[in-house]
């Protein structure tokens, strides 16, 4: 998998951006179900952050506004950012919060934000698409701009997941596993090495999903 073509530039395309959003808003799809489950976990983590009106949160990459409705419940100011203008166009109506401060196009490895600007940075559906060097750049930048919390998702590589992927590849030739699933120990080591402490971790669905969401603290 090429990081540049399959991730960084992939969703700067209206057709692909729309297809991404449709997977969790239309029909009964496994992706839609797991993303719904993920929202429950994210909501619980956000509650733990105890925001007030002086706080701010960064949703990056915001994609098509997947968690915009959840964020609307909180009194903190919200900023959404993505490298894809096409994705942000689709997210235009997904952040109803009166404290929404708008969209800003940026690369998550090199954002224009101030150090310690946000009480929480949310990074979803990204890390499993990145090679190790880019993951390190992302974590370094996220550490720089948060002053307290990070909510971040990964896809975990494990023996059980390998068995599941093998079964699904037989059942459905169209099944494509996460392009860069990572062993749990590697994830923990990467988070700790950049100064982030894991407070909570939760699998979306045990065995059936490789996705795990972490709440970490600076």
Regions found by a protein language model. Name each.
Residues 1-56, 63-110, 134-137, 151-218:
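Class I (Rossmann-like) S-adenosyl-L-methionine-dependent methyltransferase catalytic domain
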Residues 125-129:
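Short catalytic micro-motifs in class I SAM-dependent methyltransferases
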Residues 122:
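A conserved beta-strand element that flanks and buttresses the S-adenosyl-L-methionine
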Residues 113-116:
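Short amphipathic alpha-helix with an adjacent loop that forms part of the alpha/beta core around
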Residues 75, 118, 146-147:
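Short, well-ordered alpha-helix to beta-strand connector turns
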Residues 136-148:
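A short glycine-rich, Lys/Arg-flanked "PGG" loop and its adjoining helix->strand segment in the class I
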